[in-house]
Design a protein with these regions (language model features):
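Hydrophobic/aromatic-enriched cytosolic interaction surfaces used to assemble or bind macromolecules
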Residues: 1-377
Length: 377
């Protein structure tokens, strides 16, 4: 692990940031699929050189070891098939084994904070400090109550999670170079697509994956709130499976086919046709969406309480569930904020082959691939 730690690029500063302009292959390992992206800078443009959406075939009852082997073999096979020569990899973590805290420390230099990080961070981390890998990024310097301080993003990831991810990458023939957090990877995409005319108004991201939803609020290019919410695509699938007393695979198919009914005219038509299947699916998704809306409200209230003149300008959906039919419209109606679905390839040339319904799932992977052009000193 010492060798690996010396080469890791950052959980917003984990280890030494060593990459310059070299390319990295981005590997986003989700619970449902592996997303792989390789970008190449060609003059002023970014070109997609390789991409892959690799469903994880391991069965639900598969052991962690069986699942790991499945992921390694799938990833290695893809790299060989696509003749990907780049061997330095960027990946990201999320879930309940990763903690992100915004902390104010007495003003220290980066070197001083690196030396004393474990001591300074321990009060803010709900894990044994010896069981986590720590990283940090200094956001700003300030004076508070007459004392000089630094505002810092503090990240802690359980060492066993970091080691497991490193083992997968190395098993596939890759060298772990950068380890980030899902929400911070999305921040890189945000920098490319954000409208500077929005000023201080923030964007809320909902990266709705299979098991976890990454919620983040980005203000002026800086992520100010990060949460992982365990209301996700699989939660919707389970609700549909319960309502129809069917297998998860069938429920997932129904979710993709029907989505949620939003317009009153569509609802009236569905009722007139007696389409109980569509109505039942919409009701099941709607119930889960209400729980997600509640979590969004809590996060927004927290963000607004942190300072004056704060507002959410829009919400951006990403992740594999973002394309669920009418989910964006439903959330917009519930939250009274414009909601759009992310296309992380909108500024990338050569991405025409990526299907529209898969694009939102690549938000984290594209953000990781951008780390070649945006790193921290």
């Amino acid at each position: 692990m010492d060798v690996v730690k010396a080469r890791l690029g950052a959980l917003k500063g984990l280890g030494e940031t060593f990459l310059g302009p070299r390319d990295v292959v981005a590997v986003d390992i989700g619970s449902y699929a592996i997303k792989v992206v390789l970008l190449k800078q060609e003059g002023a443009a970014l070109r997609l050189k390789a991409w892959g959406h690799l469903p994880i075939g391991a069965k639900a009852e598969a052991s962690p070891e069986e699942r790991k082997i499945e992921i390694i073999n799938s990833l290695r096979g893809f790299l060989i098939e696509k003749s990907v020569g780049v061997r330095e990899a960027a990946t990201a973590l999320s879930g309940n084994a990763v903690i992100v805290r915004y902390v104010k420390f007495p003003r220290l230099t980066k070197t001083e904070l690196q030396t004393t990080l474990a001591t300074e961070a321990e009060p803010f981390i709900p894990f044994d400090i010896n069981e986590v890998q720590l990283g940090f990024y200094i956001l700003s310097e300030m004076v508070e109550d007459g004392q000089k301080k630094i505002e810092t993003v503090l990240v802690a990831a359980k060492k066993e999670l970091v080691a497991a991810r490193v083992e997968i990458l190395q098993g596939a023939g890759l060298t772990p170079a950068i380890m980030d957090v899902d929400s911070f990877a999305l921040e890189n995409v945000h920098e490319r697509i954000r409208d500077r005319k929005e000023g201080q108004a923030a964007t809320l991201y909902l990266n709705i994956g299979h098991l976890v939803t990454n919620l983040s609020i980005v203000e002026s290019g800086v992520t100010r709130v990060v949460r992982d919410v365990f209301i996700s695509g699989s939660t919707m699938t389970k609700a549909i499976a319960k309502a129809f007393q069917c297998e998860p695979a069938k429920a997932d198919e129904l979710k993709k086919r029907h989505g949620v009914i939003v317009e009153s005219t569509e609802k009236e038509k569905t009722l007139a046709e007696g389409n109980r299947e569509a109505l039942g699916v919409s009701q099941a998704i709607g119930q889960v969406a209400r729980d997600l809306v509640g979590e969004v409200h809590r996060s927004v209230d927290f963000y607004l309480s942190q300072g004056p003149d704060r507002a959410i300008a829009r919400i951006v959906l990403s992740g594999g569930t973002a394309c669920a039919k009418n989910l964006d419209k439903h959330l917009s109606g519930e939250l009274k904020v414009p909601v759009t679905v992310l296309d992380p390839f909108v500024f990338v040339s050569g991405a025409e082959a990526v299907p529209a319904d898969l694009r939102p799932a690549f938000g984290v992977a594209v953000g990781l691939a951008l780390r070649r052009n945006r790193d921290w000193e």
